[in-house]
């Protein structure tokens, strides 16, 4: 349901009510004319009146004629006052955008960019400011709608509006705009954006993932998010997208500017394309049959140089000064020939059929001292995955508007310029690298063990060493292999594949051809990049980007089916490299968790941390204590961790020592009559001076032992007051007497 009304003079609002049946309704309200009046278009978007975003769209007055791309910039500004917080940075003000903000920028950019007229060269900037936020609501999908609405009002040549919704599969129902609390019960979560085309809603962008709890919910009987279920979710999103688009249209009709005349710069004129086609078509068609990327690109460069020389300076120099046009026409001809061959001959650049996968290779343990590593290759795409394990205290701390304050699994993706044989900047990650890392992270989170099952912080790094199509999905495969090599007990292995799409008008009807495992060139010249990751049982993540105004959902459903077949093939190759978790690397720390009563936490810590510091110093272990009484003990080796656990248990779960028990104790005090030895925290015993000399009389205790020395002792007696008498045990002499016979008496380390 939608509604539009005029408030004060010049202030208009439109409302979209989204009905989720048993899950209630969500209300999205768009208001314009009150804030940011000097922007070309501005909208305040509300979600149930608590979450409030301001979106402002502006455009430069003069075009950037020298650009060969559309200069669209999307920025998301998270204001901490939106959640009633002061930033945690040193200067107590917002700094660089958070990962959530960067990912939201990408969510907005991807459906908006193809909606602008082709050839626009004026700089366009969309700035979304988060001004108020209900802590239960993700703001990203509201931002998509706000950005579309402000752009629709701006007078720019924009074929919107674009509607965006988050859909969560909860108890068998697809729910729009779910809260974080509802997402805790969700099996699948996806953001879908689209626009109204005729009587249908065309899908423009999808970003989807299974949740941390998906595997457990499916095991308990919930519907697994299979390809068919995901396709049904795309259909379920359409009515909500339609409602949101209609509200934006009504607002634009009431308050929008007329579309202004903006100069459009076609990449080339028709005469340039005709000249290039006549000069190079035959040679280009042959070059596009070369399977090797580098050989093909070298040959294309040669042909392009010859074409520029021929039509740019020869034949009366009719294209002199129009070299950029000739270059753009050459690229357009390349695109045309690639697409024609796919549509007509069902053959791709490297000679594969539509559903064929390139050669696959998987190997683990490729970096000597890494906790886990793997190399995954698909054709010329080569990804190195490296896993690092450590204490949970090293998990990432997050200072953003998200309710998530820590991140245990961190996935970082690097794309150096040499991966494509080029030079370029290296250093801090760009938005693309952050987005690709987040996609691979979402693909793996549903199969990770819980904190209780595997109490480690996990850092996964994906190094794109060679790129020719879908390094992000290659990263998913390499990461699965690497984590298994590190000994991480994944619930199931995950693989990913990138799908493409080529469309053409034949007899007045649009025909679509889906491609499995696309090359970089097929991504560049095709209409869609559709990445799907999952296990054998269900989809864990997917991402859709399109250059079209939208793609019918039945075409996406077909692509999902092709992706499933390819994923199964890749999983088989990965299983040959490693089928189950390896033993943990000797270089990885050993982390163990134990639970103690909450009222014992203070005793374990001790006054001013004295007790926990002494345990750390004596054993070399690192200890982290949670508020619920969970204690994580990490050490370089198992014995050190066990020693620390014994000491903690002796404090929190004390057991009285018994006569005959043996301990490796520490001398804590000497006196004229003997030495006091610490057996357990808070439990000392006395070795009388007469028992220190191995039967020989000694005059002074310090002649035999000093404070800090380790002694192997046995409890000889415990009197009625609990005082413990000890005797020194000479294990070597005793073992010699027994001829190496095994000792049955229990020993404990203090």
UniProtKB/Swiss-Prot annotation:
- Indicate the segments forming the S1 motif domain, all copies: 660-729
Catalytic activities = RNA(n+1) + phosphate = RNA(n) + a ribonucleoside 5'-diphosphate
Q: Does the keyword Transmembrane helix apply?
A: no
Record's subcellular location: Cytoplasm
Keyword Nucleus applies: no
What stretch or stretches form a coiled coil here? none
Instruction: Give one GO biological process term.
Output: mRNA catabolic process
Listed SMART domains: KH (SM00322), S1 (SM00316)
Primary site of residence? cytoplasm
Name it.
Polyribonucleotide nucleotidyltransferase
> What does the record give as the function of this protein?
Involved in mRNA degradation. Catalyzes the phosphorolysis of single-stranded polyribonucleotides processively in the 3'- to 5'-direction.
A molecular function annotated in GO for this UniProt entry is: 3'-5'-RNA exonuclease activity
Q: Which UniProt keywords apply?
A: Cytoplasm, Magnesium, Metal-binding, Nucleotidyltransferase, RNA-binding, Transferase
Cofactors demanded by this protein: Mg(2+)
Q: Which GO terms describe its cellular component?
A: cytosol
| InterPro entries, per database record | ExoRNase_PH_dom1, ExoRNase_PH_dom2_sf, GPSI/PNP, KH_dom, KH_dom_type_1, KH_dom_type_1_sf, NA-bd_OB-fold, PNPase
Q: Which domain of life is it from?
A: Bacteria
The UniProt similarity line reads: Belongs to the polyribonucleotide nucleotidyltransferase family.
Q: Residue limits of the KH domain?
A: 589-648
Q: EC number(s) for this protein?
A: 2.7.7.8
In which residues is Mg(2+) bound?
A: 523, 529
């Amino acid at each position: 349901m939608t509604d539009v009304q005029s408030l004060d003079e010049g202030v208009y609002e439109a409302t979209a009510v989204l009905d989720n049946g048993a899950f209630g309704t969500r209300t999205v309200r768009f208001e314009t004319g009150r804030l940011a009046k000097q922007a070309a278009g501005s909208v305040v978007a509300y979600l149930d009146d608590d979450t409030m975003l301001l979106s402002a769209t502006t455009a430069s007055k003069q075009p950037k004629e020298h650009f060969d791309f559309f200069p669209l910039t999307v920025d998301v500004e998270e204001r901490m006052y939106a959640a009633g917080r002061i930033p945690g940075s040193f200067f107590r003000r917002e700094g660089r955008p958070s990962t959530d903000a960067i990912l939201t920028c990408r969510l907005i950019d991807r459906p908006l960019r193809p909606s602008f007229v082709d050839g626009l060269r004026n700089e366009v900037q969309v700035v979304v400011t988060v001004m108020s936020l209900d802590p239960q609501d993700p703001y990203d999908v509201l931002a998509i709608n706000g950005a579309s609405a402000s752009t629709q009002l701006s007078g720019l040549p924009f074929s919107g509006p674009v509607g965006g919704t988050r859909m969560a599969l909860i108890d068998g129902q697809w729910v729009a705009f779910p809260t974080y609390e509802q997402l805790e019960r969700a099996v699948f979560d996806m953001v879908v954006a689209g626009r109204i085309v005729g009587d249908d809603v065309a899908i423009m962008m999808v970003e989807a993932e299974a949740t941390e709890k998906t595997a457990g919910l499916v095991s308990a009987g919930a519907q697994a998010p299979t390809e068919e279920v995901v396709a049904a979710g795309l259909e379920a999103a359409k009515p909500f997208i339609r409602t949101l688009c209609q509200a934006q249209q009504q607002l634009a009709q009431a308050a929008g500017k007329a579309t202004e005349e903006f100069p459009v710069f076609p990449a080339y004129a028709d005469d340039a394309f005709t000249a290039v086609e006549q000069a190079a078509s035959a040679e280009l068609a042959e070059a596009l049959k070369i399977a090797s990327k580098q050989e093909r690109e070298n040959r294309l460069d040669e042909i392009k140089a010859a074409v520029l020389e021929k039509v740019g300076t020869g034949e009366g120099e009719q294209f002199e000064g129009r070299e950029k046009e000739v270059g753009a026409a050459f690229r357009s001809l390349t695109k045309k020939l690639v697409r024609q061959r796919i549509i007509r001959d069902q053959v791709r650049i490297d000679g594969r059929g539509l559903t064929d996968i390139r050669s696959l290779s998987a190997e683990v343990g490729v970096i000597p001292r890494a906790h886990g590593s793997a190399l995954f290759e698909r054709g010329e795409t080569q990804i190195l995955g490296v896993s690092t394990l450590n204490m949970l205290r090293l998990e990432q701390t997050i200072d953003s508007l998200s309710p998530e304050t820590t991140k245990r699994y961190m996935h970082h993706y690097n794309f150096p310029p040499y991966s494509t044989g080029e030079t370029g900047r290296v250093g801090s990650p760009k938005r693309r690298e952050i987005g690709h890392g987040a996609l691979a992270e979402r693909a793996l989170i549903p199969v990770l063990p819980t904190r209780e099952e595997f109490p480690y912080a996990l850092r996964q790094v994906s190094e794109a060493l060679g790129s020719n199509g879908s390094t992000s999905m290659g990263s998913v495969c390499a990461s699965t292999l690497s984590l298994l090599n590190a000994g991480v007990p994944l619930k199931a292995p995950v693989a990913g594949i990138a799908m493409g799409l080529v469309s053409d008008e034949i007899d007045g009807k649009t025909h679509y051809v889906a491609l499995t495992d696309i090359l970089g060139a097929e991504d560049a010249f095709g209409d869609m990049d559709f990445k799907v990751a999952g296990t054998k049982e269900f989809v864990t993540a997917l991402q859709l980007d399109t250059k079209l105004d939208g793609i019918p959902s039945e075409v996406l459903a077909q692509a999902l089916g092709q992706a499933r077949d390819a994923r199964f093939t890749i999983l088989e190759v990965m299983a040959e490299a490693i089928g189950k978790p390896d033993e943990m690397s000797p270089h990885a720390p050993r982390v163990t968790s134990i639970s103690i009563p909450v009222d014992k936490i203070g005793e374990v810590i001790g006054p001013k941390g004295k007790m926990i510091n002494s345990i750390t110093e004596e054993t070399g272990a690192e200890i982290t204590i949670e508020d619920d009484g969970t204690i994580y003990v990490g050490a370089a080796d198992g014995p050190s961790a066990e020693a620390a656990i014994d000491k903690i248990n002796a404090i929190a779960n004390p057991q009285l020592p018994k006569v005959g028990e043996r301990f490796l104790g520490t001398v804590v005090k000497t006196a004229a009559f003997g030495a006091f030895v610490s057996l357990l925290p808070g439990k000392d015993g006395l070795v009388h001076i007469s028992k220190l000399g191995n039967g020989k009389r000694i005059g002074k205790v310090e002649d035999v032992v000093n404070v800090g020395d380790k002694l192997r002792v046995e409890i000889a007696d415990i009197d009625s007051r609990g005082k413990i008498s000890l005797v020194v045990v000479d294990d070597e002499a005793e073992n010699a007497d027994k001829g190496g016979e095994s000792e049955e008496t229990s020993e404990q380390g203090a």
